[in-house]
Design a protein with these regions (language model features):
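Short, intrinsically disordered N-terminal pre-domain segments
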Residues: 1-32, 44-48, 133, 143, ...
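N-terminal intrinsically disordered, low-complexity, charge/repeat-rich segments that act as generic
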Residues: 1-39, 43-46, 130-136, 224, ...
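Acidic, glycine-rich low-complexity segments with interspersed aromatic residues
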Residues: 40-44, 132-209
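Conserved, function-critical positions that sit in or immediately flank catalytic
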Residues: 46-133, 262, 266-604
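Aromatic/pi-system hotspot detector in well-structured domains
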Residues: 174-176, 225-226, 270, 324
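Signature of Asx- and small-polar-rich beta-strand/turn repeats characteristic
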Residues: 180-213, 234-271, 356-360, 365, ...
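Elongated alpha-helical scaffolds
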Residues: 210-229
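GIY-YIG-like beta-to-alpha core
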Residues: 229-230, 486
Length: 604
């Protein structure tokens, strides 16, 4: 079955993403999407290996694990951390170098001392394996288990509004060294399949669809123009190089139509689309992409107001022909389902066409033809003075039709806006401390419609904390970020990893400890146990040896979260909403005096 998913579908989805940010009567309406940009993963990337069916001998940090025969093993690595059902690994090696991997269900063995050492007796069966290092983050997985992990490692989230998102398109600057020639808009580009049976039409730069064409440009004043004509004629079938930078300033620009016409060189015709305002330049202009302004932008609205459905702007000479009335300037009506269109063309002494242009744009055309038979040619634009045409006269002029609605009527569709860029600025400890500044993160993403913690109510706040927190009193020393913390609790031991430690103003012993708990690193007898509001059982740091008690009397808001009996939950309900975008990155380090502008480009 022959079928395609068209670019229009992708453009539609990009439009829907942006429109969903403001739809509905209020912030909690079902029509509106509450999108949040989140950061997470404070702990370093290491290779991850699930294990099961362990024997009674434990794997040891610093020892190796391997599969097969040690001297010729297909996989071996150094143990960096040991969990109940997984290992973190470094220094991966084997028959395929760092790309070596233990097949699912492999017999895994522990070893100390390397080639001169011996097996430790520790064994297990291998499960899912994912290679990663700080320089090579793992590819995200699109499954439910991964989603649970995203929430466990989430640090904070910031609301995405329409002020932080734009449709973007590929960036093409006015630069005649990098971009000497541009494609022109045509409605009928297509590919020529390798198997035959179809002959398509390519653009000047070899693209097989308008979606892949280089047919627009941003000038030095951040004005965006679309190329309607690039000098194509029978002698230059792929067009010619541009010579003049299009601009809305000067005599070559016609404000009544929004067209800029070159008066030198190939005679390029450009359609003005919009001007990117300074704020959008700063937020959404990158080395690869440039924004389409919002519909409310004044320059865009002016362009939309000029759009005329089915108006014709370009006439191409397909075949210069011969035998037409010689050495004349001639006019003919554009035949089709529209009205008012007129083509003007000039012939030489042999009756061949030497130039052609649109005299009157007309409107309403979805197909168009230019006829040269007797009775169709005139010597004046009013089409009142007929010129006889001989029976042997031949030639061909193509009228290039605009997109539906006319040029400038639908910017996203016309410019192939199938990508959305979000630009999120994290300013210091944004959200009164929701975004800690004393740690780093390695994951960014977007979650749609998360709930407030402990509810089924959509979150609407500007920022949300994804961390658990405890108010500490009587700390013996400073806790260290990324260290493991423990507390004796009912039924066993609670474990966590420190994300942030912030002393109270003027204190050296009291502060807020923010942490994560994951199902891999923080289980006790198969269970992730919660830290308790117990002033007698201290919380202790593994590497710092810091020890402090829960301030069970504390019940105020501090650093973006609200405490009850010294404990504070995240502000995001675990596993709520839909994670629609995830990107694993190298570490991004935060600092108290630092601002990050993070750009995400989502292609639909």
């Amino acid at each position: 079955m022959a079928a395609i998913i068209s670019d229009k579908f992708r453009i539609f989805n990009a439009k829907q993403f942006l429109e969903s940010l403001t739809e509905g009567p209020n912030d909690t309406s079902a029509e509106r999407s509450r999108m949040y940009f989140f950061v997470g993963r404070p702990q370093p990337w290491k290779a991850y290996l699930e294990i099961h069916t362990k024997n009674s001998t434990a794997f040891v940090v610093g020892n190796e694990v391997y599969v097969g025969t040690y001297g010729s093993t297909a996989f071996r690595a150094t143990v960096a951390a040991v969990y109940d059902s997984a290992l973190l690994l470094t220094d991966v090696f084997g028959s395929n170098g760092v790309n070596s991997a233990p097949p699912l269900g492999s017999a895994l063995k522990g070893r100390s001392g390397g080639s001169g050492g011996s097996d430790t007796g520790a064994t297990a069966v291998s499960g899912v394996y994912r290679y990663a290092t700080e320089d090579v983050p793992p590819l995200p997985l699109d499954n439910q288990t991964e989603k649970y992990g995203l929430y466990d490692e989430m640090i904070a989230a910031k609301r995405i509004t329409d002020a932080f998102a734009r449709t973007v398109i590929r960036r093409y600057n006015w630069d005649l060294v990098a971009n000497p020639k541009f494609d022109m808009w045509k409605p009928d580009y297509s590919a020529t399949p390798g198997g035959g049976g179809q002959i398509g039409k390519q653009t000047a730069t070899g693209a097989t669809s308008i979606a892949d064409a280089k047919f627009y440009v941003m000038n030095s004043s951040y004005e965006v123009f679309k190329c309607l004509y690039n000098g194509e004629d029978p002698s230059n079938t792929t067009g010619q190089n541009a010579t003049e930078e299009p601009t809305t300033a000067g005599a070559n620009y016609a404000s009544a139509t929004g067209l800029y016409t070159e008066t030198t060189g190939a005679g390029y015709i450009w359609k003005y689309m919009y001007t990117i305002p300074t704020d959008d330049v700063l937020k959404f202009l990158s080395s690869d992409f440039m924004p389409i302004v919002l519909p409310a932008n004044a320059s865009r609205q002016a362009t939309v107001a000029l759009a005329t459905a089915g108006a014709c702007d370009v006439a191409l000479i397909e075949n210069a022909g011969s035998g037409l009335p010689a050495s004349q300037t001639l006019y003919t009506s554009i035949k089709g389902d529209g009205t008012g269109g007129i083509v003007k063309f000039v012939t030489n002494g042999a009756g061949a066409i030497t130039s052609a242009e649109i005299e009157a744009r007309g409107s309403g055309y979805t197909y168009a033809n230019v006829l040269f038979a007797n009775g169709n040619l005139f010597s004046n634009a009013a089409l009142s003075s007929a010129v006889a045409t001989g029976a042997s006269a031949v030639g061909a002029i193509e009228v290039v039709l605009p997109p539906a609605g006319g040029h400038g009527s639908d910017h996203e569709t016309e410019l192939n806006g199938k990508r959305v860029m979000t630009n999120i600025r994290l300013t210091y400890s944004e959200g009164q401390g929701d975004f800690p500044v004393d740690n780093d993160f390695r994951r960014i993403g977007i979650v749609a419609d998360p709930y407030n913690y402990g509810t089924t109510t959509f979150a609407t706040a500007d920022t949300l904390s994804g961390l658990k927190s405890v108010k500490i009193t009587g700390a013996s020393a400073d806790f260290s970020v990324d260290e493991k913390i423990t507390q004796t609790v009912t039924g066993g031991t609670a474990y966590g990893t420190v994300v942030s430690w912030t002393l109270d103003s003027g204190s050296t012993t009291a502060g807020v400890l923010k942490y994560i708990q994951t199902t891999d690193a923080h289980t006790d007898q198969g269970v992730v146990r919660a830290f308790e509001s117990n002033g007698s059982n201290a919380i202790t740091g593994e590497s710092s040896t810091a020890s402090g008690n829960v301030d069970t009397s504390y019940g105020s808001s501090l650093l973006g979260v609200t405490f009850a009996s010294g404990l504070a939950n995240p502000e995001i309900e675990n596993n709520s909403g839909n994670v629609i975008y995830v990107e694993n990155r190298r570490l991004i380090t935060r600092a108290p005096d630092q601002i990050e502008d993070i750009k995400l480009v989502i292609e639909f």
